[in-house]
Amino acid sequence: MDTSDEDIAGTEERPMAARFQLVIDCADPEPLARFWAAALDYELEPPPDGFATWDAYWRDLGVPEEELGTGADRIVDPSGRAPRIWFQVVPERKAVKNRLHLDIGVSGGRAVPIETRRQRVDAEATRLADLGALLVGVHETEGLDHYAVAMEDPEGNEFDIN
């Protein structure tokens, strides 16, 4: 069958690039949102125009009272380039290793001397530990010119700094 004239991927029906948000399951969204906003230089997402708070917005949409959160459950990149992150309340606690994690790049890459990269990574790890993160381990492979640290956010979600 000749498919040369067909749009197999369906791009004709998708006039713009797909956008996504990252969703992080958690027990208490507000402190986790504040942690990650500080970690990533994000900010808490302001309520939509015309609303003083997220609660007012959700109530206007008819969301039941028992489903309302604090409103401080989503963060955005102030530049608008990186994805929005939403912190979703779930009843269960984290039980196993994440299948997806964030890497926070602060070292400058391999063009930067390893000692400088190590200092940058360690300084960021200290900053995030002061915000509530836990240092889990150091990844340094001799001969591979690589240095990173593994950490957990305040609810135990793994992330790396490199």
Residue ranges and their predicted role:
Residues 15, 27-38:
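Hydrophobic ligand-binding cavity/cleft-lining segments
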Residues 13-24, 40, 47-49, 59-66, ...:
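Vicinal oxygen chelate
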